[in-house]
Each structure stands twice: as structure tokens, then as C-alpha cells.
């Protein structure tokens, strides 16, 4: 708990975190399921696991941790991280945990989603037995192809309408395609129920898609402050510098959200005139689009 204590001393209000230490296969399997090992089974999750495993085996990528937005926050740590890596990762986790707690886009997410996912998986198994695996899997394929087409304004609605009850008429935004299909499409009852379950999950994951740069930037901002401020021993400085620079390094591939988010938060801290107060205010109200703008 030393890392959390140092984080709180530095001004970061860290909520309760439960840590699980796993090997790389277990971590890749959990990551493929979006952080929920109790989630329903589907071939796309298996395909994602295979991609993560091959990336790890070929040295193309490595997951050091996985943080899940629940209450308490659930953090999966890689068993074979070196001591300085584990310290860095735990400082990084503290940033994620605070971001989930404080950012406005997460205000209406369901923090009991671990139990909800388990209930969804049980119901999907029942429907698969009743209607056939091929029919169910084919329908889930179609829903998953649209699962980013939910509206941020629908997050609160999703909390209030579990199971197969559709949202209220007249309260759906045009961009909430899954919501409109759920309400208006002539679907059999079992398909409507599956759609409602998957839409609830899509609404849960939506804030993470909208704040990827900010979330990773906030975690990186705090791991760098904590590690260089009080957590590092003299003998660990070089190892930390190698780990940090590896995570922040640029490439010819996709944008690095860790680097971009870190530099944006450092810019706010250095140039806004508000110091840490301005940084905390920024992390509370923005998504990636408004933050970059």
C-alpha cells in the first residue's frame, strides 16, 4: 500500500483498489474479454486473445496491467513484472482509478458491472440452449458490428432499463442506433433481450472509448510524478527511465495515447496558471475531443 499512500500524500485521491496478480496468458484472456473474465463467450473474444498471445510471443506488444472500472476498482498486474516495473504499474493504476472515479463521462457507469456481466453471460447461455448457438452467435455478430453506435446521453437510460425493457419513447438521441433498433425494430423477444444486454455493455464501455487519451495520459502523468518524486530508489532510476521511455516512445504506427495525454496534462500544469488545480479540473470535465481542442 506504499504506492497508494504516496499518491494520496501527493494529492491524488485514490479510491479503494483490489489487486490480482496473474500470468501473461491469464492477463491476455481477461483483456480479450474487456476486463471481465465472467463475460459471455464469443468467437471474437477468442480471436482477440489469439492476437494478444501472438503479439506477446513475437515481442510486438505486452500488457503490463489492466484496470477495471468497478467498485472497488479491480487491477490485474502481471506476475513477472520486475520490481521497478510493478511499482511503476501500481502508480499508473492509481491514476486510472482516480480517473474512473472523477471524470464526468464515467459518472453514470454501473460500478457493479462484474456481477452484471456474469448475469448477462448466464442469460446468453440460456438463450443459446433455447434457440441454438448458431442463431444466437449470428445475432450477436450483427449487434457487435454496431456496438459503438450508442449515444453518451443514453448512459443514464441504460442504468434505468435493465434486461429486455427498452428506453422510454422520445428520449433517444439520433446517434443511438442500438437504442433505436431496440425500441423500433420488429425483433423476436429473445433477440430484443440479447440486444438490450449488449447495449448495456456498450454503454458501459463507451466512456473508455471517448477518453482513451485522457485516461492513459492521466495515469502516465501521475506515475511519472510519483516515481520521480518519492517512489524511486537510486538504483532503480535507469530501469525506470527505460520502462517509461519505452511506453512513451513514438513510432510510425498509430498515435501513442500515453505520450499525447501526458504532454497535454503537462502543458495544462505548466501553462494554465492554475497548477495542479487546473489539471484536476481538466481531468474532471473533458473527453478526448474537447481536451485536445
Residue ranges, per PLM feature:
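Auxiliary, metal-adjacent structural segments of Zn-dependent hydrolase domains
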Residues: 1-73, 166-185, 189
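Generic, well-ordered alpha-helical scaffold segments in large soluble proteins
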Residues: 2, 6, 93, 97, ...
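Acidic helix-start/capping segments at beta-turn-to-alpha-helix junctions
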Residues: 18-28, 111-112, 116, 241-246
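Short pre-active-site segment immediately N-terminal to the catalytic Zn-binding motif
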Residues: 52, 72-89, 206-214
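Alpha-helical scaffolds flanking conserved acidic
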Residues: 83-88, 115, 235-243
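Post-HExxH zinc-binding segment in Zn-dependent metallohydrolases
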Residues: 95-158, 219-234, 245-255
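Internal metal/ion-chelating core segments
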Residues: 149-213, 217, 222
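Non-catalytic terminal regions of proteins
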Residues: 236-293
Amino acid at each position: 500500500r506504499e504506492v497508494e499512500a504516496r499518491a494520496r500524500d501527493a494529492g491524488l485521491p485514490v479510491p479503494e483498489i483490489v489487486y490480482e496478480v496473474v500470468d501473461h496468458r491469464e492477463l491476455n484472456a481477461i483483456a480479450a474479454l474487456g476486463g471481465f473474465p465472467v463475460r459471455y463467450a464469443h468467437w471474437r473474444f477468442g480471436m482477440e486473445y489469439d492476437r494478444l498471445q501472438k503479439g506477446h510471443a513475437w515481442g510486438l506488444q505486452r500488457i503490463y496491467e489492466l484496470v477495471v472500472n468497478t467498485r472497488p476498482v479491480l487491477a490485474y498486474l502481471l506476475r513477472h513484472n520486475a520490481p521497478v516495473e510493478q511499482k511503476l504499474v501500481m502508480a499508473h493504476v492509481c491514476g486510472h482509478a482516480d480517473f474512473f472515479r472523477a471524470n464526468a463521462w464515467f459518472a453514470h457507469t454501473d460500478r457493479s458491472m462484474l456481477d452484471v456481466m456474469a448475469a448477462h453471460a448466464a442469460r446468453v447461455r440460456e438463450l443459446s440452449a433455447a434457440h441454438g448457438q448458431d442463431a444466437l452467435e449470428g445475432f450477436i455478430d450483427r449487434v457487435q458490428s454496431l456496438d459503438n453506435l450508442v449515444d453518451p446521453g443514453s448512459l443514464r437510460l441504460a442504468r434505468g432499463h435493465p434486461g429486455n425493457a427498452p428506453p422510454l419513447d422520445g428520449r433517444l438521441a439520433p446517434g443511438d442506433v442500438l437504442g433505436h433498433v431496440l425500441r423500433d425494430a420488429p425483433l423476436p423477444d429473445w433477440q430484443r433481450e440479447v440486444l438490450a444486454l449488449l447495449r448495456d455493455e456498450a454503454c458501459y464501455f463507451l466512456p473508455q472509448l471517448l477518453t482513451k487519451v485522457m485516461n492513459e495520459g492521466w495515469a502516465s502523468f501521475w506515475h511519472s510524478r510519483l516515481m520521480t518524486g518519492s517512489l524511486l530508489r537510486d538504483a532503480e532510476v535507469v530501469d525506470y527511465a527505460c520502462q517509461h521511455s519505452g511506453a512513451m516512445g513514438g513510432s510510425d504506427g498509430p498515435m501513442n495515447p500515453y505520450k499525447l495525454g501526458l504532454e497535454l496534462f503537462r502543458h495544462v500544469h505548466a501553462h494554465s496558471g492554475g497548477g495542479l488545480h487546473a489539471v484536476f479540473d481538466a481531468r474532471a470535465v473533458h473527453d478526448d475531443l474537447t481536451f485536445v481542442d
